[in-house]
């Protein structure tokens, strides 16, 4: 990530500002959907280390921690499901996913929609309208950052990070 300047970051664990430096990179695979087909990309993820000893992976918003699928891949699957563009079987075939994977994403989306909006507002807002609102924001990063700060996990992340972990948003 070209824009990341480790010397300006604040460690989300100890709070030290300017104590991080580039530590390493690791490879990661990510499934996306391009030109009508699922595509697997290989990415290089930067890791920082703080003087307190904690290391941190710098993930762009389109990567969901602990998921091999990209955020926009999952949102596209869900959008096509909510729009009822095809049968569930065809949808799963088109995106090369299992029915159980689709159900997991649907359950997770509904749960996190309710967490974000609150139970009553969630019942009033359709899943499709919530999804559209996410995608129509001027900066998805604002929502993603607010979600992490509020719930200590990324949107559509299936579980909280292993303890002891202090996922927060890096920033100057």
PLM feature spans:
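Short, conserved DNA-binding cores of transcription-related domains
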Residues: 1-64
